[in-house]
């Protein structure tokens, strides 16, 4: 199963992607992590991308798509993937479809986490991320045990510059002005599901999995049935 997860900054997309990979036994491919790894390893595509990033320019689609498809060609991703942060445009989605077709694969589901803009702003204003592994915390909803320190690896927590002020407004403008058109693209392919992202994390996950099983026709005997209990202590 290959899944595209669509959501604005602050929608909980990264959190749900991680949970879905565990529940469904898939791999998680986050575009931001892919770029960081390519820069660190100084791959040929990574170095080409870095020249644009260093100039403050957008990385051309041909490089971004090539990096994603190269990773998806790894045998470790053959059983399925949750794509997080890619594609961002219809052009990227079309290029992804063509590349997957050459591999004999396809996108099965595109899931949209629907969260009101005002809620996104409230979430982002209190979001903090650890420097080591990008674990996410929130004041006051999900604070760390020790102020400013990641519970998992003890690294420093920081607030991204694009999570505040005009920067976050601009990123949301881009999402609701451009990326949102992906919904129409996948709707026309009958692959789109919409999920209320303005719920507890466990509730969002349970709703996503229910939709996936309905869409794909899986039952509890399928290898895609969740690998852990989804019973929530919330509400």
Region annotations inferred by a language model:
Residues 1-235:
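Glycine-rich phosphate-binding loop of ATP-dependent small-molecule kinases
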């Amino acid at each position: 199963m290959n899944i595209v997860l669509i959501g604005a900054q602050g929608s909980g997309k990264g959190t749900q992607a991680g949970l879905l990979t565990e529940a469904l036994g898939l791999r998680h491919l986050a575009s931001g992590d892919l770029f960081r790894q390519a820069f660190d390893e100084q791959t040929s595509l990574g170095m080409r991308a870095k020249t644009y990033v260093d100039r403050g320019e957008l990385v051309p689609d041909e490089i971004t798509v090539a990096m994603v498809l190269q990773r998806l060609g790894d045998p470790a991703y053959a059983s399925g993937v949750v794509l997080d942060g890619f594609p961002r445009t219809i052009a990227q989605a079309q290029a992804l479809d063509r590349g997957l077709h050459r591999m004999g694969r396809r996108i099965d589901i595109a899931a949209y986490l629907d969260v009101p803009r005002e809620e996104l702003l409230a979430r982002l204003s209190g979001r903090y991320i650890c420097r080591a592994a990008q674990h996410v915390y929130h004041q006051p909803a999900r604070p760390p045990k020790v102020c400013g320190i990641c519970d998992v690896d003890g690294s420093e927590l920081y607030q991204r510059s694009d999570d505040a002020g005009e920067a976050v407004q601009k990123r949301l403008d881009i999402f609701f002005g451009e990326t949102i058109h992906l919904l129409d693209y996948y709707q026309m392919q009958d692959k789109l599901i919409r999920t209320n992202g303005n719920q507890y994390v466990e509730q969002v996950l349970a709703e996503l999995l229910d939709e996936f099983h309905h869409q794909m026709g899986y039952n509890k005997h399928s290898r895609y049935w969740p690998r852990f209990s989804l019973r929530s202590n919330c509400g």
